[in-house]
């Protein structure tokens, strides 16, 4: 057990996170900004945990040294979370009365009451320090996806019948070449000092895990001074970095012809009964050197989403405007999953927009696409949740974003007392909305047709908190930025009644806000979709 306490201080003055992050962290590596309209968190890693599934290589680094182990990352995380269990919270009195009683609810945040003039008994938000980062899609090799417990088709052995048993079950990388060494299969920061922004109440908290109050106070004082020196210069922002003279080219891993051919191949497997639904995706790249933070700020303005995020891993970064929640765990052990299946573009007039949204979920295809994945998520949660606790609380809800309407269902369940977020993650990963169903068979077909690793795309990112809570988003609508290259994925669910050309256009529709943000940031006069 660690002899640490959680110290937090509520500041009397509000600061906009879009001003704070560039001022405190723009010139630093290993930083994060989990960012949305209700709660945001930002800070810098005190440790970095990287993992490769090909040889079970786990590395743990801080500023002074790197420790290398042969250990499964889930085993490591189980031990770490257990060792931090029971860390007490210590609040530093604020300079003014607390706001009136309210209950906050946020994609990234928590839900705890605060009374007028009362001292807080704990932070209002769920993240109290812990792990921030991602698990890439290929981490499925160490989850229940590669166990026959992961799902059944109407045939006795969906893995055998999908003709890709080696790809989806036997080989740890699902038949693919090894991932880019610069991008681990999983990469997490350990975070013990961070800022938490409550956007609803315009409150800013400084939070520190420390063995003594003096160390926490020193960090509070230093950070408060930096915040007090902020100017208004960051409030105005030129989204265009520079004029990009050459035509900007976006290149997919599958051409239009190949993607449509793969859709038809998926449908053959579906008709044979090897699967019910397959999520086929495409990877798109652009060779360009660009300021990652400038691009992220362009993306968050153009395509605001429940799970915006910027995570700088040093030699690459994750820039996300993900709309989809994978898994959330609250302080009472309640799990929420919100699979997103069913998409339609926005209308160019209000009347047309409402009509398109109204139709979503009412067609047989949209309904089937969503409900199949709801059943899959219920099955995944059933491995780890209390019997009888799993409920579909909000089926087939239409949610609207900048470029699309999406069909979302909400499933809840209660974790069994002997389980935690790591058990849940291994039971449910990868998210069924990005595989299809049955999960094992769908993963095998995906491996056969896509032929390249998905990498970070279609995995999950977010936080695992030391207090047992977690919030993880699906890694979609997300740019992975290298020093001189950008990449992102897009795709959709294939059913027997899918129209191949329409599925291809839906893939492009989902890629549109990412392409638009890149073009806007570069100031490119022309761009080419090399599809």
What is each residue range found by the language model?
Residues 1-87, 122-147, 180-240, 244-531:
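Extended alpha-helical targeting/anchoring segments
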């Amino acid at each position: 057990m660690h002899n640490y306490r959680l110290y937090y201080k509520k500041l009397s003055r509000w600061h906009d996170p879009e001003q704070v992050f560039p001022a405190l962290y723009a010139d630093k590596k290993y930083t994060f900004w989990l960012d949305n309209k209700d709660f945001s968190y930002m800070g810098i890693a005190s440790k970095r945990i990287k993992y490769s599934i090909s040889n079970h290589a786990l590395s743990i680094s801080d500023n002074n040294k790197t420790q290398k182990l042969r250990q499964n990352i889930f085993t490591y995380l189980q031990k770490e979370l257990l060792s931090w269990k029971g860390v007490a919270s210590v609040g530093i009195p604020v300079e003014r009365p607390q706001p009136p009683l309210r209950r906050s609810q946020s994609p990234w945040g928590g839900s705890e009451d605060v009374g007028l003039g009362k001292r807080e008994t704990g932070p209002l938000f769920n993240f109290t320090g812990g792990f921030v980062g991602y698990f890439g899609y290929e981490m499925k090799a160490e989850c229940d996806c590669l166990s026959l417990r992961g799902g059944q088709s109407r045939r006795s052995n969906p893995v055998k019948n999908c003709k890709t048993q080696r790809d989806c079950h036997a080989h740890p990388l699902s038949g693919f070449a090894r991932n880019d060494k610069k991008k681990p299969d999983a990469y997490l920061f350990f975070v013990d000092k961070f800022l938490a922004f409550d956007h609803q109440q315009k409150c800013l908290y400084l939070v520190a895990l420390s063995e003594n109050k003096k160390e926490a106070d020193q960090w509070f004082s230093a950070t408060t001074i930096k915040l007090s020196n902020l100017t208004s210069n960051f409030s105005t922002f030129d989204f265009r970095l520079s004029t990009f003279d050459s035509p900007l080219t976006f290149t997919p891993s599958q051409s239009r012809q190949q993607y449509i051919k793969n859709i038809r191949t998926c449908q053959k497997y579906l008709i044979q009964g090897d699967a019910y639904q397959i999520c086929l995706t495409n990877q798109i790249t652009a060779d360009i050197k660009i300021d990652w933070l400038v691009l992220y700020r362009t993306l968050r303005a153009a395509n605001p989403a429940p799970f915006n995020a910027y995570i700088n891993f040093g030699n690459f970064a994750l820039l996300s405007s993900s709309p989809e929640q994978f898994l959330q765990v609250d302080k009472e052990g309640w799990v929420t999953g919100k699979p997103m299946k069913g998409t339609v573009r926005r209308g160019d007039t209000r009347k047309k927009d409402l009509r398109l949204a109204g139709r979503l979920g009412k067609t047989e295809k949209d309904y089937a696409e969503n409900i199949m994945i709801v059943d899959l998520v219920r099955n995944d949660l059933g491995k780890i949740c209390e019997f009888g606790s799993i409920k579909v609380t909000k089926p087939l809800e239409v949610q609207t974003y900048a470029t699309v309407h999406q069909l979302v269902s909400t499933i809840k369940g209660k974790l069994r007392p002997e389980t935690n977020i790591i058990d849940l993650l291994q039971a449910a990963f990868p998210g069924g909305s990005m595989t299809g169903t049955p999960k094992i068979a769908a993963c095998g077909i995906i491996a056969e047709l896509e032929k390249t690793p998905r990498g970070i795309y279609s995995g999950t990112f977010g936080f695992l908190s030391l207090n047992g809570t977690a919030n993880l988003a699906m890694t979609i609508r997300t740019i992975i930025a290298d020093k001189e290259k950008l990449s992102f994925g897009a795709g959709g669910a294939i059913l027997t009644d899918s129209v191949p050309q329409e599925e291809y256009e839906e893939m492009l529709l989902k890629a549109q806000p990412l392409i638009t943000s890149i073009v806007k940031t570069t100031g490119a006069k022309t761009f080419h979709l090399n599809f």
